[in-house]
Amino acid sequence: MSKPAADDGYSAYEDSWRMGLLLVLGLLIFQAGALYGMGRTPICTCGYVKLWHGVVNSSENSQHIADWYTFSHIIHGFLFYALVRFLFPRSPIGLRLAFAVLIEGGWELLENSPFIIDRYRAGTISLDYYGDSIINSVSDTLAMVLGFVMARRLPIWVIVSLAILFELGTGYLIRDNLTLNVIMLLHPFEAIKQWQSGI
């Protein structure tokens, strides 16, 4: 005797999440392995791991689990959820999540390439930036996953409000955020760099 259609739908939904999470796990393992092959250190060279590191102009920035830039990666999750929902409206949610992780992981590998590291050091205030530790990079991707899940679960007005709050909050507290980061990476402005240096 076959199960009711509603049960079949719920089962397919669960299977989608399981498949997506397995793909996400595989992508995270690949990301960590690729970063190790690129010479990234597993943890901070200071020898310990902190849950939060809040000093931006520090050699330990982007070396621990979370920092001020974690909020930018959560916003990535908001944006990627909207993107994959637009591009693949009929695809299972698990596959959409895996695609978002693929994009984020690809950016993490690019961000830790010599070209982007040198670009950050030359065009932004990140003079002490020499690349992420592996634990920080993987944590950034998991922050994106958190943002993706939040975007799926919460009303759009909450997501938009949170994105604005994160951008304004980090902009005020550390004079940097996702918007400024993109601007300074693509086309550095000396006025912005000088303003950021005043922190």
Swiss-Prot record:
Keyword annotations: Cell membrane, Membrane, Transmembrane, Transmembrane helix
Positions of transmembrane segments: 19-39, 68-88, 154-174
Cysteine disulfide partners in this protein: none
Signal peptide coordinates: none
Record's bilayer topology term: Multi-pass membrane protein
Localization terms from the record: Cell membrane
A single GO cellular-component term on record: plasma membrane
InterPro entries linked: DUF2585 (IPR019691)
Lineage: superkingdom: Bacteria
Family recorded in the similarity comment: Belongs to the UPF0314 family.
Name used for this protein in its record: UPF0314 protein mll5005
Organism: Mesorhizobium japonicum (strain LMG 29417 / CECT 9101 / MAFF 303099) (Mesorhizobium loti (strain MAFF 303099))
